[in-house]
């Protein structure tokens, strides 16, 4: 019996103001857990897989049921402890403590290998939580679309005089994260050719409005890119195929995209990357019968994929790793110069992290889109001079279809997050929205992750692999009163390559919530400024000074 498979279940978060838990502070994690498994949100909900290879919301269906039952009976001064997707304890704490504490996929460093994780996973002792899958704050592809948009805009600013009209981006991967790329590209004014090996993923991105159309062949896809370059009308095109075959073929043909990147699930060479020349059926069968053969074939295929990206880079085309660890996989197989093209964080995003700016997100627990539109307006009211952000919110309302509970992603930083959280809480208190608002973020944030091949690649002081920072972030968020806090390993780049922390806090309209929101939404981004200031980044040191952060080691 497969305890992780149930084809009969359809999970959706409840909507409205009636709750089945004892308070909104426990109803919120309950709804967000269920929302992660909504068929409009999750990649494989019948297997509890939300996104990112095998990123799960719960370890198995029995654990899911026990989590739900535990949340429904949890008292206002109790905390539920969840170990890799299984509820293991309920303890008396206090009303300002987190209602849920989550640890996912954490392994003692010497044993933190994919092989050892897979053995524990098969034994039913662990699950892979990715970043927001096992921490119950995934909001569909919107969760990464603004970060991807900001990256593409910055590439355009640096390399194309700030104008991506008539330019096109080559990428691969249309899963839960990669599926944001086509919409982010067209929002930024560029066209995109996205290669994807699974038809269901192309269909989902077409259905949810993230992808404009599908090409029947590579020739048709290239013709559409050429036409868009002339008309300067941005279009996103999905192509069914294998990136390990398509990328090298484009190099052979002498095709020159304007930007090259990749968001296949290369971090998981067994479950996330189709080997060159294999069918989906063969891949699925061999994942169960001979996973080591799949891993070897996948990583061998990645060498050709990365070599093609290196070839584009050598042509002078802006080429960037988008954080899936594909360079490391290729280097492991002998491609010595795999890291010759940069990751997106050190190349384009780190200046934002130095100011504590990152992927702030919120969801309307009512299920009513109007609640999100009202919060959009509140963001504009409180940040009247941020025209770039206003433009983003306008585009998001027009072009992003909600998946599951209505939600919004909005990159803001220290000094603004707590103001927005307090304003949302006041809206709940005054009845301007129909139910509380849940506020969280990706683990990909300025102070909550250690990932030497992604968020902390090429740190100024060489502290790329120091993982004290996400641990301190999680501890501080617990002390500050976040509603649930998570500490994960392996998200984004795979087992052995990252540690990261998440937090979620509920704005339920009460004065107690206001006090928690003010603490959490100040301290959380402040840890990012602290981390980068400690590494010697002048922008972060200046931000700390302006905001009055007390950083003893940097006292002047």
Curated annotation (Swiss-Prot):
GO molecular function, one term: urocanate hydratase activity
GO cellular component, one term: cytoplasm
Signal sequence interval, chain numbering: none
UniProt entry keywords in alphabetical sequence: Cytoplasm, Histidine metabolism, Lyase, NAD
Top-level lineage group: Bacteria
Record field: catalytic activity: 4-imidazolone-5-propanoate = trans-urocanate + H2O
Subcellular location(s) per record: Cytoplasm
A biological-process GO annotation: L-histidine catabolic process to glutamate and formate
Binding site for NAD(+): 52-53, 130, 176-178, 196, 201, 242-243, 263-267, 273-274, 322, 492
SUPFAM superfamilies linked to this entry: Urocanase (SSF111326)
Chief site of localization: cytoplasm
Cofactor(s) annotated in UniProt: NAD(+)
Catalytic residues (UniProt): 410
EC number(s) per entry: 4.2.1.49
Binding note for cofactor: Binds 1 NAD(+) per subunit.
Family per record: Belongs to the urocanase family.
NCBIfam families in alphabetical order: hutU, PRK05414.1
Function: Catalyzes the conversion of urocanate to 4-imidazolone-5-propionate.
Name this polypeptide is given: Urocanate hydratase
Provenance organism: Bradyrhizobium sp. (strain BTAi1 / ATCC BAA-1182)
Higher taxonomy: Bacteria, Pseudomonadati, Pseudomonadota, Alphaproteobacteria, Hyphomicrobiales
Gene: hutU
């Amino acid at each position: 019996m497969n305890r992780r498979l149930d084809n009969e279940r359809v999970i959706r978060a409840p909507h409205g103001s009636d709750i089945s838990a004892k308070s909104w502070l426990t109803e919120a994690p309950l709804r967000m857990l269920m929302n992660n498994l909504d068929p409009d949100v999750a990649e494989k909900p019948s297997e509890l897989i939300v996104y990112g290879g095998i990123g799960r919301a719960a370890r198995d269906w029995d654990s899911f049921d026990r989590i739900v039952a535990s949340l429904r009976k949890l008292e206002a001064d109790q905390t539920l402890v969840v170990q890799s997707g299984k509820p293991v304890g309920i303890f008396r704490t206090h009303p300002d403590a987190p209602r849920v504490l989550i640890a996912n996929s954490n392994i003692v460093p010497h044993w933190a290998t994919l092989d050892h994780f897979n053995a524990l996973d098969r034994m039913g002792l662990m699950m892979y939580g990715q970043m927001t899958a096992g921490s119950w704050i995934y909001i569909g592809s919107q969760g990464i679309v603004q970060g991807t948009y900001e990256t593409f805009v910055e590439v355009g600013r640096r390399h194309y005089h700030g104008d991506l009209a008539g330019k096109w981006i080559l990428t691969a991967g249309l899963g839960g994260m990669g599926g944001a790329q086509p919409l982010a590209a067209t929002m930024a004014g560029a066209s995109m050719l996205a290669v994807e090996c699974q038809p269901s993923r192309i269909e989902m991105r077409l259905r949810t409005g993230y992808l404009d159309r599908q090409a029947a062949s590579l020739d048709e896809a290239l013709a559409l890119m050429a036409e868009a370059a002339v008309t300067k009308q941005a279009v996103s095109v999905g192509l069914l195929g294998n990136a390990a075959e398509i990328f090298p073929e484009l190099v052979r043909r002498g095709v020159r995209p304007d930007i090259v990147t990749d968001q296949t699930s290369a971090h998981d060479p067994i479950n996330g990357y189709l080997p060159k020349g294999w069918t989906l059926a063969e891949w699925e069968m061999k994942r169960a019968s001979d996973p080591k053969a799949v891993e070897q074939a996948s990583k061998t295929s990645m060498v050709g994929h990365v070599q093609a990206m290196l070839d584009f880079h050598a042509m002078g085309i802006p080429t960037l790793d988008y954080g899936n660890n594909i360079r490391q996989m290729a280097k492991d197989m002998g491609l010595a110069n795999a890291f010759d093209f940069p990751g997106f964080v050190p190349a384009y995003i780190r200046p934002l992290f130095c100011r504590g700016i990152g992927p702030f997100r919120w969801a309307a627990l009512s299920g009513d889109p109007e609640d999100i539109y009202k919060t959009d307006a509140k963001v504009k009211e409180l940040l009247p001079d941020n025209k770039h952000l206003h433009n983003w919110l306008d585009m998001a309302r027009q072009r992003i279809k909600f998946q599951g509970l209505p939600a919004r992603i909005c990159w803001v930083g220290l000094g603004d997050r707590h103001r927005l959280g307090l304003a949302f809480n006041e809206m709940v208190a005054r009845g301007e929205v129909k139910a509380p608002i849940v506020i969280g973020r990706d683990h990909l944030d300025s102070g909550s992750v250690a990932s030497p091949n992604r968020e902390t690649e090429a740190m100024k002081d060489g502290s790329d692999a120091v993982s004290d920072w996400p641990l301190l972030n999680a501890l501080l968020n617990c002390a500050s009163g976040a509603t649930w806090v998570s500490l994960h390993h392996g998200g984004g780049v795979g087992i052995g390559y990252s540690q990261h922390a998440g937090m979620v806090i509920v704005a339920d309209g009460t004065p107690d919530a206001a006090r928690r929101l003010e603490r959490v939404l100040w301290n959380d981004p402040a840890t990012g400024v602290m981390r980068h200031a400690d590494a010697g980044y002048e922008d972060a040191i200046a931000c700390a000074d302006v905001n009055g952060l007390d950083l003893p080691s940097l006292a002047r």
